[in-house]
Each structure stands twice: as structure tokens, then as C-alpha cells.
Amino acid sequence: MYPFATTGNTKDSLYKEVNLPAEFESVLINKLAALDHRYLKDLKINLGNVLKSQTLNRKEALLIALSVAVNEKNAALITALEELAKAEGADEKEIAEVTACVSLMNANNVFYRFRHFMHKEFYDNAPAGIKMSIMVNPVLGKEFFELLSLVVSALNGCEMCVTSHEQSVLNHGGTPARIFDAVRVGAIFKSFSVLV
């Protein structure tokens, strides 16, 4: 059913899945490929599976993957995923909003994680003082913006933010299955970005 995968074509097919050029060099992927490590095959399958979600269309899955690349500051993956997202109909405003969302969530994740750790009345009651106008009327739509915010917050480990954004996604018509699929995209692309 599956053709025999050699070291070269396992790496090549992995790169093709996420639009990285064949000549792209990753020390860690090269080490795994040199050993024909079975994890590369698993990773390729995982990447393909999360990009073919039941509850996310391909454009949405790619924009979530892009949010991971931006969060992890992975320039090669950002470029590759932007191209794939554009091929699925994403425009410059949507791509820019993904970047803005990731940046804002990084501020919020640090701030609210601090509040959560401290459990002190002063910190809990003091105004955050963080401008968040992009959350009011997002180009991507409120439900999807909240879904992106949830994934980035999960990546950054902010329990308060994850809980809040999960409820907001549900309030805006999202489903638990859609949330689960989005977080899976985030998890798999985080695992890939470790190697790239």
C-alpha cells in the first residue's frame, strides 16, 4: 500500500507537506533522516492529518499552523505557511492579523499567567492597561480569532487565557471538536518547529 520510503524521500515528503524547499537544511532533521528514523514518517503523517481536519478547513488549519510558526519565530516556516495559506485564499490582512494576534497573546499570556501565579488582590484588581482593539472586530471573524488566541495561549502555557478563550470560542458558535482539532494543529506544528 505504501511505497518504500528512503531517507531522502522521507525528508523530501516531510518538507513538501509544509512547503519548505527541498534544499532547506535542518541539522536536527538531517540527523534523523541519516538514521532513517521512523519518527520522521510519523511526523509527516501527523502534519498531513492535522491539515485535513474534520472541523477546520485547510485555510484555517494553515493559519493556525502559521500562528505557531510566528509564535516560535521560525522564519522559514512562516514564509512557507504564508504561501500555502495564500494558495487556500488567505489574504494579506488575514495573515497580518495572525501575526498581530500572536503578538497580543504573548503580552496577555505573560500578564495573566503572572496574575494566576500570584493570587494577590492588588494584581487581580489593577487594570491590565493592555490595548486590545484588534479583538473587537477581527478580520478573521470573532470565533476564529478566539480559536487562534486559544491555540497560542496553550502553546505559551497560560491556564487563565486558555480557559477564557475556550469559553469565548464556544460562546461564538465553535464546538469542542473544533477546539480539539485546532489545539492538535498547534501541538503538531510546535513539535515540527522544534526540529526546523
Describe the predicted segments one by one:
Residues 1-60, 71-139, 168-171, 178-181, ...:
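Acidic, glycine/proline-rich low-complexity segments that act as flexible tails and inter-domain linkers
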Residues 137, 142-147:
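Short, intrinsically disordered, charge-biased short linear motifs at domain edges
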Residues 67-68:
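Amphipathic alpha-helical segments that form the core helices of the histone-fold
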